[in-house]
Amino acid sequence: MSIVSFEFLGFLAALAVVYYVLPMRVRKWALLAGSAAFWLLCGWQGAVYLTAETLLIWGCARLIGRFSERRGVCRALLVGGMVTVFGAMVLMKALAQLQALPDGLLVPIGLSYFTFQSVGYLIDVYRGKVTPEKNYAKVLLFAGFFPQMTQGPITTWKQLMPQLDSPHRLSPDGFVSGVFLMAWGFFKKLVIADRLMPAVSMLVATAQELPGWLVLATAAMYAIVLYADFSGGIDIIRGAAELLGIDLPENFRRPFFAASIADYWRRWHISLGVWFRTYLLYPLVASRAGIGLAKVGKRLFGAKAGRAMPGAAASMVVFLLIGVWHGFYWNAVLYGLWFGLLTAAGMLLDPQFRKIRKRVTAHRGGVALMKAFGWLRTMAAVLLAQFFACTTSPGMAFGMMGRIFTDFGAGMTRNFPLGMQDGAVAIIAVLLMLLVDILCEKQSDLRKKLAVSPLYVRWTLLMGLIFLTLIFGCYGAGFDRAAFLYAGF
């Protein structure tokens, strides 16, 4: 079941009614029953996979709690659980990419998301940050909460479980806020992403015939499509959760306003970045290898470089894995390595950048100049990364980049696949999305202010947003065929 479908809206409405009608003490079980129904509607194989994985994680966590004084046993349980679930995930994704899955077997929707969430819980139990849960049903609900499991955001036990475990009263303000967020997500997905994606696909397929300016525009359009698609899906998910009284964390925070690569990744797919920093990057930096690398770096290059080297090396590892997470092909690896190299270089060269920044900002207008330079540098790096993301081979990616420098051109082209009307709608919709992002950047509590605004203001804006989506949205057959780009992960 796609979250962009009338079936999902009907399912959510029915579950919300049942949830708020039932006595408070049993409402969490209504969420579990509703989530189980959602898994089955998405495919029984995925439901079986999720059940088996959470059983393993629950069992390992319980045993870690039982043998907490025996670190060797606990470490073996942690490693065994992680290797098993990550190994199964990698195998499923590899077989799917090779089109070698047995007949009738499908990759569970949101496989990576609920796997990362489950493993995070197991690591937190091992570290003593979370008490092992005795009730398996709660672990199952935590990993498989139905809106979230499709494409995140990835949460921790302490973030999510207290909310799922506590009954919620129907809040008019929360309800309005959730509906607005869902409507805004539908707008971004259906009006922007699904309108631009076919055009981007056609442009990429004919890239060798395009002038360089249009190749560059294609990369920019693809970045917009990814943002509108992924953040739109997250908005729908967070809004649906808010209707049930659950507050999921923000997963995108205006990434195209970032002034550095590090800032960009603090704004883009936030929960994935937090997961990798918490469970991989920080442990790598604090490991014996990280400490040893710092000592070697200090001896060879000085104290500042020595302190930066463990973080730089760990960032390379993290971004390489993020690239592989996107797929088992060279473009995904290059995508991760590109951001890893930029992040590592930023860490190692930070002392030099600080000196330059200090000199420039000492002059009038220097602060604004550095901000503008930082933004342009970051967006150029992000645009180059899109060539790896939107193509299927390094040759295609580098070929598109080459067109920018060898045949930039300045004239129009007959190859642009977006008509005048669709182009106008797309431009206006993107500008509206940009305006909302600017307002949110200046006022982070914009939705809260909207929720308490006069009734006629709320309803006018909400009905207008729904009307625009219904009129200008692009719908697949049955209103659910345009799958989210990140749901397959």
Can you describe what each PLM-predicted range is?
Residues 1-488:
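Membrane-embedded transmembrane alpha-helical bundles that form the catalytic cores
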